């Protein structure tokens, strides 16, 4: 029973739950970026290059024979994957940059000095009176 309670304590920690949410959102974001690159970015680029569909770009190493599919280097899909990565990396970079800026602003925000208590105020007045008495001839 000890292992189960340890696992439960581990699983409900804030960091683990936050990480799980981040992974799920990251996977969904990856799908959105893949669709954006494949369906929005690549078609105009292919059109500018001369009507090329990047997902079909490949070098056939061995032609298909019977039931055996062809062996190809699908470099067009690789180019799309590289663009996916660049967009995701840039989005993460910008997010981290914003978070770091917010953290710096929080750290720099001046805090008001604490109001001295009545006892501290009284002690300060006594100190000032003693200093004044010591200065008099």
From Swiss-Prot:
Coiled coil: none annotated. It comes from the Bacteria. One of its GO terms (molecular function) is mechanosensitive monoatomic ion channel activity. Disulfide bonds: none annotated. Keywords: Cell inner membrane, Cell membrane, Ion channel, Ion transport, Membrane, Transmembrane, Transmembrane helix, Transport. It is a multi-pass membrane protein. The chain crosses the membrane at residues 9-29, 79-99. GO terms for cellular component: plasma membrane. It is found in: Cell inner membrane. InterPro entries: Mechanosensitive_channel_CS (IPR019823), MS_channel (IPR001185), MSC/AndL (IPR037673), MscL_channel (IPR036019). HAMAP family: MscL (MF_00115). Homopentamer. Belongs to the MscL family. Channel that opens in response to stretch forces in the membrane lipid bilayer. May participate in the regulation of osmotic pressure changes within the cell. This is Large-conductance mechanosensitive channel. It comes from Pseudomonas entomophila (strain L48).
